[in-house]
Regions:
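Sec-exported extracytoplasmic/periplasmic mature domains
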Residues: 16, 35, 52, 216-219, ...
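Short secondary-structure boundary/capping segments
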Residues: 119-120, 181-182, 206, 246-247
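N-terminal activation segment of mature serine protease catalytic domains
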Residues: 63-144, 165, 302-305, 309-320
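Active-site region of chymotrypsin-like
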Residues: 125-131, 190-201, 226-319
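Conserved active-site neighborhood of the chymotrypsin/trypsin-like protease fold
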Residues: 134-142, 149-226, 309-314
Length: 320
C-alpha cells in the first residue's frame, strides 16, 4: 500500500501545481484521490498474482479466501494479468519445461477454435496447480496436475523433482495435505497422494489419433487456469531428457501437438471432447507453437504399476 500511496502522491502533486493557480482545487482533490486509489489497487493486484505461486499453504489459502482480492484480480483485464505473469516469471526463477528438438510430424500453427462441451467444463474442476520449492536449485517450481483416482493426482516428474513438500492447490485456491508416492523420471510421470481431496477423478481414455482436435488444461506461467485447443500432429517415438539425471532417455512414444504450451502447463491433462484424458503435457519444441504429451497408454501402464502406492518416495534432484 505504501508504494501505491507514493505513486498517488506524486500524481497529486503534479496536478496541484496546475490547480493552485486555478479555481479547480475541488476537482484536483477528487482526481488525486482517484489516482491514489487506482495505484493502491494496482499494487494489490500485482502482489496477489505474484504471491499466489509461493508454495506456502497458509498464504495461498489466505489469498484465495479474500473476497476483496479475488474480486480485484477477477476484474483485472486478461492482458494486464498476462503481462504481470510474464514479468513475474522473467524476474523470478520458476524452473524449466523440457524442450524436444526431434519432430515427429510437420509443424502447424496452434488452432484457435476451442472445443466446448459440458464434459470439458466439468473436467476443469479436477485440474489442480502444483507448487513447490526446489531448494537445491534455488527456484519455485510451478506446474499442473489432475485427479486420476480418488485422492491421487497425476503430474510430471520434473514438476516435483527436488521438491520435498509440494503444494496441491485446487481451482478454489484451497491447499491439501499431500505425499509424492510415485516417480518415473524416464516417462516423466509422478503421482501425488492427496487423501482428502474432494475432486472427481477424470476418466483415462485411449490414445488420440493424428488430426484430432483436443483440449489441454492447466496453469500456464503459474496461473490463472486456462483451457486451450490443440491439434494432434502425430504420435510416434522420440528421445527426451531424464528429469533426474539430465541424460537422454531411450526412445519413447509421445504426441506432438500444435499447441501453445507454456511453462506451468507441465503435468496438465490433454482431453477429448468427452472429457476423457488422452495424454499428459510434458514439454514443448525449441521454437514455434508445438507441444509434447505423454500418451494415455503410457499413463495407464504407470497407474497400473504405482497407482496404489501410499508410501512416500524420493523426488530426486531438480534440474536448472
Amino acid at each position: 500500500l505504501t508504494i501505491g500511496q507514493w505513486l498517488g502522491l506524486i500524481a497529486g502533486r503534479t496536478i496541484r501545481k496546475v490547480t493552485d493557480i486555478t479555481p479547480l482545487k475541488g476537482i484536483e482533490r477528487f482526481f488525486g484521490g482517484v489516482l491514489n486509489l487506482a495505484a493502491c489497487a494496482l499494487v494489490m493486484v500485482v502482489l496477489t498474482i505474484s504471491m499466489r505461486t509461493v508454495p506456502i499453504p497458509q498464504l495461498n489459502t489466505a489469498l484465495s479466501e479474500s473476497k476483496t482480492l479475488s474480486w480485484m484480480v477477477a476484474s483485472t483485464p486478461e492482458v494486464v494479468k498476462d503481462r504481470i505473469n510474464t514479468v513475474r516469471n522473467d524476474v523470478l526463477a520458476f524452473g524449466t519445461i523440457p524442450e524436444v528438438s526431434q519432430l515427429i510430424a510437420p509443424e502447424t500453427s496452434a488452432p484457435t477454435q476451442t472445443v466446448e462441451s459440458a464434459a470439458l467444463d466439468q473436467a476443469a474442476a479436477s485440474v489442480v496447480e502444483i507448487l513447490g520449492a526446489a531448494e537445491q536449485c534455488g527456484y519455485t517450481s510451478t506446474g499442473s496436475g489432475f485427479v486420476a483416482d480418488n485422492g491421487l493426482v497425476v503430474t510430471n516428474a520434473h514438476v516435483v523433482a527436488g521438491v520435498t513438500s509440494p503444494v496441491v492447490q485446487d481451482s478454489r485456491g484451497r491447499t491439501w495435505p499431500r505425499t509424492v508416492v510415485y516417480m518415473d523420471t524416464e516417462q516423466d510421470l509422478a503421482f501425488i497422494s492427496v487423501p482428502k481431496l474432494p475432486l472427481e477423478p477424470l476418466n483415462i481414455g485411449t490414445n488420440a489419433t493424428a488430426g484430432s482436435l483436443v483440449t489441454f488444461m492447466g496453469y500456464p506461467k503459474g496461473g490463472p487456469f486456462k483451457a486451450l485447443p490443440a491439434t494432434v500432429q502425430g504420435i510416434g517415438n522420440t528421445q527426451t531428457i531424464d528429469a533426474d539425471t539430465g541424460r537422454a532417455n531411450a526412445m519413447r512414444q509421445v504426441y506432438q501437438l500444435a499447441a501453445d504450451v507454456q511453462h506451468g502447463n507441465s503435468g496438465g491433462p490433454v482431453l477429448d471432447e468427452n472429457g476423457n484424458v488422452v495424454g499428459v503435457i510434458f514439454g514443448r519444441a525449441t521454437s514455434g507453437q508445438t507441444g509434447y504429451a505423454i500418451t494415455a497408454s503410457t499413463l495407464k501402464q504407470a497407474l497400473a504399476e504405482g497407482g496404489d502406492n501410499t508410501a512416500a518416495v524420493s523426488t530426486g534432484t531438480c534440474r536448472k
